[in-house]
Amino acid sequence: MKQTIRVQIREPGVILAGEIVYGQRRAWGNLSYRPLKLSLMRPRPSSGAAQNVPLIVWLCGGAFTEVDRDIWLPEMVWFAKKGYAIAGVDYSTTYRTRFPESAEDVKLAIRFLKAHAAEYGIDGNRIVLMGESAGGYITALCGLTGKNREFDTGGFENYTSEVQAVIPWYPLVRLSGMKIEPDRVTLPHDITAYADITGYVTRDAPPFLILHGSGDSLVPLSQGELLYDSLQKAGAYADMIVLEGAEHADTAFVQPEVKALILDFIEKKLP
């Protein structure tokens, strides 16, 4: 059967650039270097369309011991089709380095992306930082310290790591003594030195949207509520969405209605 159809373009195509090196860390007895990489997904440019799109920087979790920048990217296609670029960022883990190098890496990635905004077709003044679990902790910490230089190392220091909105999913907030994964990983001392990120909360914090499941048996709902309450008390803008019955890293977090709520927050808060 032969058909001729007329197709109405309702959403953009999506393209992916993987293996982008944004920095490096010393390795093997400080005698060699290992690359720090990100993957960048964005709407495919079309004739007459705006080229510089807003950016979501995404951080996956992994108990501070492992990270995979691409593992959640299939779920992020939804946002790319709504007109956003998404950068999945690898960061240092505690098996290789000491904290706060993971936060330093993420802030370096943000500055790198700002420095290369024209090249990648992104708007360096419209950046959202979003992450889950351990990545949610780093998301909140980096979002709260964007206006100071505490963790700014590695290059591109003529740019700041400031972002315009912060969206941590089921984040760790007060870490001291917590087990990340039952019977397997306990937070090392160098992380617990930064045990309570509410100490970084100020009135000038960027807008926050916190997502947490009421049934989270790994990172209790009280952790997300602690961050929300701290932001509210400081006079900063904060929203919180509690997913009834949702566990840690639950599939509920990637359902269309939840993504739509995230998008609504982003569209209201980006300049």
What are these regions (language model features)?
Residues 7-12, 25, 163-200, 206:
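Mobile cap/lid helix-loop segments that gate and shape the active-site cleft of serine hydrolases
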Residues 59-61, 113, 212:
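The conserved beta1-alpha1 loop
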Residues 108-180:
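Primarily recognizes the serine-hydrolase "nucleophile elbow" in alpha/beta-hydrolase
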Residues 69-88:
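Short amphipathic alpha-helix adjacent to the substrate-entry channel of hydrolases
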Residues 50-62:
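Short beta-strand element of the alpha/beta-hydrolase
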Residues 210-212, 216:
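Short beta-strand/loop motif that positions the catalytic acidic residue
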